[in-house]
Amino acid sequence: KPTDRKEAFQMLKAISGKTHRVVTGYSIQGPGISLVDADIADVTFRNLEDWEIEFYVKSGSALDKAGAYGIQDFIGMVGIEKLEGSFYTVMGLPIYKVYQALKPFILEGRDLIMSYEL
């Protein structure tokens, strides 16, 4: 995460017109499961104009984001040219992979609930 607006601007300028890799790790711990994994997405930004970066940075959104941007924010919507991988991985939680890991436990719980008689 950037420490100030100047650093946020520099970070966004550095990825402008380039592809960068986002790696999001997660851990699931509990009875019957101990999993540590990660997912990868490649994000390509078009060449951003300085005024677009300044507009986004001045909104304050860049300061609380890893990489100084949120894929769901203005700069992500208008600046990302290509995404290879999961949108949610870039947001910070690879939902699909987490769901697949938890699915057996969800099904187990569902079967318990469905077998309960009122």
Regions found by a protein language model. Give the residues of each.
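Anionic-ligand binding patches
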Residues: 1-118
